[in-house]
Structure formats: C-alpha cells, structure tokens
C-alpha cells in the first residue's frame, strides 16, 4: 500500500488504552482506535486525553488509525 492510499483526518484523544493505543474521536464524529507511529514513539512524544492529533486511516480498515502528528 502506498502513501497515496491513506486518508488523513483530524481528531481528538478521548482516552488512553494499554500498549500505546488511544481512543480517538474524528472530526466527523466517528470513534476509532489509534496507535502511535514509530517516529513519535522514538522521540518520546507524549499524548494525553484532549490533545488534537492527525491520524491516517487505510481504506481497508476504517476502525483503526495511526497517529502521525500531535498539534501544539
């Protein structure tokens, strides 16, 4: 799958779950499970409930997402 196939959306963290997984509410109202991307994990970027994030969804599974950016 190429990078052109991903769907980028904005969302807000609702709650922390185990294993660096988060429940994210997207701007269209859907709630998905999101995990931190490798670069964010490598640079120890902390994510807390209430943070605004950018997530990437694949067209194959719209219930899971990858968190790629945390807004300041």
From Swiss-Prot:
CDD domains: S1_IF1 (cd04451)
Locations listed in the record: Cytoplasm
GO CC terms, sorted: cytosol
Alphabetic keyword roster: Cytoplasm, Initiation factor, Protein biosynthesis, RNA-binding, rRNA-binding
Pfam families cross-referenced by the UniProt entry: eIF-1a (PF01176)
All copies of domain S1-like, residue ranges: 1-72
An example molecular function term from Gene Ontology annotations: rRNA binding
Gene3D superfamilies in the cross-refs: Nucleic acid-binding proteins
Subunit structure: Component of the 30S ribosomal translation pre-initiation complex which assembles on the 30S ribosome in the order IF-2 and IF-3, IF-1 and N-formylmethionyl-tRNA(fMet); mRNA recruitment can occur at any time during PIC assembly.
Function: One of the essential components for the initiation of protein synthesis. Stabilizes the binding of IF-2 and IF-3 on the 30S subunit to which N-formylmethionyl-tRNA(fMet) subsequently binds. Helps modulate mRNA selection, yielding the 30S pre-initiation complex (PIC). Upon addition of the 50S ribosomal subunit IF-1, IF-2 and IF-3 are released leaving the mature 70S translation initiation complex.
Family named by the database record: Belongs to the IF-1 family.
Protein name listed in UniProt: Translation initiation factor IF-1
Species for this entry: Methylibium petroleiphilum (strain ATCC BAA-1232 / LMG 22953 / PM1)
Gene: infA
